[in-house]
């Protein structure tokens, strides 16, 4: 919708968005890989819809008070890639680290707001990354997908919830890949802050 009608629009994204992304699913007939990557080619987006890509891997400010995470370092020992997500590079298929999953930080009057994509790097890694790059020690809100729904209850969930506490997050608004069970756990932990 942003690129239609066709006109020149700057799009900041990770160069990995055009990789051959696959998801492994267990079917009755056995395990199979399905394409889940970008539905449109770089050529179509740039020549057909006039997207002006600014492919970035590093943290940067993309507008006044709007920060692009870039590639988030995987530093915690409890946040791991989803083994069912794969990437094909030439003829090799391997677990996708999902380096192209991007989060944003937006400065607001109430404080910094973190918008998570799916937090494939792990929510704690994302929050720590923004803390290191901006100096913020407190976030007003964390909104978006946490990918915790695929991990289930356990160490990663507990440490992620503790990070929300440690960073004094005022508003917790998790979505899609967090899952209903983990969303309910978040609500029970932070009923006054959950949305």
List PLM regions with ranges.
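Metallo-beta-lactamase
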Residues: 17-102, 165, 195
């Amino acid at each position: 919708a942003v690129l239609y009608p066709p006109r020149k629009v700057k799009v900041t994204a990770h160069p990995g968005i055009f990789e051959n992304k696959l998801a492994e699913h267990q079917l009755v007939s056995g395990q199979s890989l399905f394409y889940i990557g970008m539905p449109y080619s770089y050529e179509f987006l740039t020549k057909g819809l006039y997207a002006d890509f600014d492919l970035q891997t590093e943290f940067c400010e993309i507008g006044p008070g709007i920060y692009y995470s870039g590639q988030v370092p995987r530093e915690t020992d409890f946040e791991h890639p989803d083994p069912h997500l794969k990437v094909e590079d030439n003829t090799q298929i391997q677990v996708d680290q999902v380096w192209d999953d991007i989060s944003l930080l937006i400065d607001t009057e109430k404080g910094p707001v973190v918008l998570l994509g799916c937090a494939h790097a792990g929510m704690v890694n994302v929050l720590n990354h923004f803390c290191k790059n901006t100096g913020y020690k407190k976030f007003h809100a964390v909104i978006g997908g946490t990918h915790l729904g695929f991990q289930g209850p356990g160490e990663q969930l507990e440490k992620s919830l503790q990070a929300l506490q440690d960073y004094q997050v005022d508003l917790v608004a998790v979505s899609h890949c967090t899952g209903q069970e983990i969303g309910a756990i978040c609500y029970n932990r932070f009923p006054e802050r959950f949305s």
